[in-house]
Amino acid sequence: MDQSVCNGISYKETGYFSQLVLDFLAEHPHIRSFYTHSPLKPDVEALIRAKKAHPQQRDVLVKALQQQYAGLDTDPAVQRNISLLEQPDTFTICTAHQPNIFTGYLYFAYKVLQTVKMAEAWKAQYPQYDFVPVYYMGSEDNDLDELGSIYLKDQTLTWNTTQEGAVGRMRPEGLDALIAQVEKLLGYGEHAEELVQLLRKAYLGHDNIQEATLYLVNALFGRYGVVVLIPDTPLFKQQYIPVMREELWHQTSHKLVSDTI
């Protein structure tokens, strides 16, 4: 095998990244003051110390997650990780993404799997701690133009719906037709039938997109212990009440932002 095909290319050579992203990855001195930790060699122990010093409501987190997973066939790895979140020496490796239908772009999977890889690597390096991979679902995003399409075999498949508002709360009406298009395009390819059945169970067997996405991500990544967090949950939003009250009475964010200008 020609080993040259296995060589990587730099982010710059792809032409897909802005200069700001390239400077960030290169840790260019002119932007280094805008962030604390290196993207290449983060000081994990410093991160842990900072998180330990920050107030945490682990009981609320675990209770909300248990409610979200109620009735779902959950892998033991996920159950274990949710339980671990109660412990003070457990920390999360998070990625966030909107609930694109059928996961949307391929990098959705890359992002989730990267949390798994980091959690495993950091556990090996710091065995006294536990690290839980978490997918934080941005289910209140209302950009259906972005979230309502997938790209398969050079074709764009779009969900035709008149619903508006938070995509995660939308009903999956009409997605049966889109799944049928996916089935036709996949044909008899490897794992095609398995994938189509998974999409049907996820989207046609649940009341809204965020529940469908939870099911889908759990089916795909639950074996790796990935925990899905849906922030559009009353128990989580109740924790934000003091922040909103502070903002209404004192406009704290305006003062903080003004100090940075």
Language model segments and positions:
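N-terminal targeting/trafficking signals and adjacent low-complexity tails
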Residues: 1-261
